[in-house]
């Protein structure tokens, strides 16, 4: 069937080309995010530590996940556990992203609920513990199939060693649906939506009360409202990018097959999320836009880059 063969080949080439483009954009964009935070002291706050963690996860998607996804799409014959490790790495950085988003949401919640005690609660030690916990959970969830929850145990051929490396050849779909999606993606997404709903509710109440006309307090909650809007947009884009692929996995598990082109589109959309956040920061956070321009001058116009003056307007923590 030469027509079908050509169609599949064309779909694969298109998929690989788009993956490479997305990967490059994700790497460049998120390296810029980290560079911006390094250059701008007003962005070196608790929330932006978690944003840097999210950027690192997105860089890993560009550097590791997308090349591995391309190898898996080609079905290269390798050892079972090498293939399984590759697919587990795909899972680790997905969960690192959602854990970082959850940490950001909790941080903003503490900021508006504990306005006076916030700095005492969010100590440097606790920030590093939270970051470590995010990544520890991500590795444990992502590497769970390596400890037995994989296709080798459910395969009729227990001596299976080498095989064409494809996602469903090694990864069990009940792990993907019940453990990865329902437990570690869907539940955190619902929790984060509830957190942001409460943040907006608290800010709206405080602004309507106006605190006896205190301009300083009004300005604080105004900044918090803008920050919460920007970060909730990041969360919305994550959900928009990852839910389609998760739903496709549910369809495969409960109902059978989906067209290969639909699967490719779901994968590409999920990976595209890694290049979206730097764009959101540039458009929604003034300090990011200013520092992006500073870097552009340094790189394109050959002016030396330097840290921005910490005395300039501070981003709310």
Curated annotation (Swiss-Prot):
Disulfide linkage: 83-165
Keywords: Cell membrane, Disulfide bond, G-protein coupled receptor, Glycoprotein, Lipoprotein, Membrane, Palmitate, Phosphoprotein, Receptor, Transducer, Transmembrane, Transmembrane helix
Lipid moiety-binding residues (S-palmitoyl cysteine): 302
One MF annotation (Gene Ontology) recorded for this entry: G protein-coupled adenosine receptor activity
Transmembrane segments: 15-37, 49-72, 85-106, 127-148, 177-197, 231-254, 261-283
Keyword field contains Glycoprotein: yes
Stretches of the chain found on the membrane's Cytoplasmic side: 38-48, 107-126, 198-230, 284-317
One Gene Ontology CC term in the entry: dendrite
Main location: membrane
Gene3D superfamilies given in the database record: Rhodopsin 7-helix transmembrane proteins
PTM entry text: Phosphorylation on Thr-315 and Ser-316 may be crucial for rapid desensitization. Phosphorylation on Thr-315 may be necessary for phosphorylation on Ser-316 to occur.
Role played: Receptor for adenosine. The activity of this receptor is mediated by G proteins which inhibits adenylyl cyclase.
Membership in a protein family: Belongs to the G-protein coupled receptor 1 family.
Name the UniProt record assigns to this protein: Adenosine receptor A3
Species assigned in the record: Bos taurus
């Amino acid at each position: 069937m030469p027509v079908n063969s050509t169609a599949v080949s064309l779909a694969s080439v298109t998929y690989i080309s788009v993956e490479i483009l997305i990967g490059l954009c994700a790497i460049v964009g998120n390296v810029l995010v980290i560079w911006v935070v390094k250059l701008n002291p007003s962005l070196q706050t608790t929330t932006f530590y978690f944003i840097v963690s999210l950027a690192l996860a997105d860089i890993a998607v560009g550097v590791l996940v997308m090349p591995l996804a391309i190898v898996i799409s080609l079905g290269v014959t390798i050892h079972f556990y090498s293939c399984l490790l590759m697919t587990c790495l795909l899972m680790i950085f997905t969960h690192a992203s959602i854990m970082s988003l959850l940490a950001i949401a909790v941080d903003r919640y503490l900021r508006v609920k504990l306005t006076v005690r916030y700095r005492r609660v969010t100590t440097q030690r606790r920030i590093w513990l939270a970051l470590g916990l995010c990544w520890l959970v991500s590795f444990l969830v992502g590497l769970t199939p390596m400890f037995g929850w994989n296709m080798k145990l459910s395969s009729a051929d227990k001596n299976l060693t080498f095989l064409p490396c494809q996602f469903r050849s090694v990864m069990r779909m009940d792990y993907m649906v019940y453990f990865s999606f329902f437990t570690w993606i869907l539940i955190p997404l619902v929790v984060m939506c509830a957190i942001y709903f409460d943040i907006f509710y608290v800010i709206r109440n405080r602004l309507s009360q106006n605190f006896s006309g205190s301009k300083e307090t009004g300005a604080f909650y105004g900044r918090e409202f803008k920050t919460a809007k920007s970060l909730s947009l990041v969360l919305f884009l994550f959900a928009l990018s990852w839910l389609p692929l998760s739903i496709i996995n549910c369809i495969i598990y409960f109902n059978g097959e989906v067209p290969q082109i639909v699967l490719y589109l779901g994968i590409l959309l999920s990976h595209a999320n890694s290049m979206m956040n730097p764009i959101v920061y540039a458009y929604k956070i003034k300090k990011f836009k200013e520092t992006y321009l500073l870097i552009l001058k340094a790189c394109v116009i050959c002016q030396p880059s330097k840290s921005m003056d910490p005395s300039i307007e501070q981003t709310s923590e």
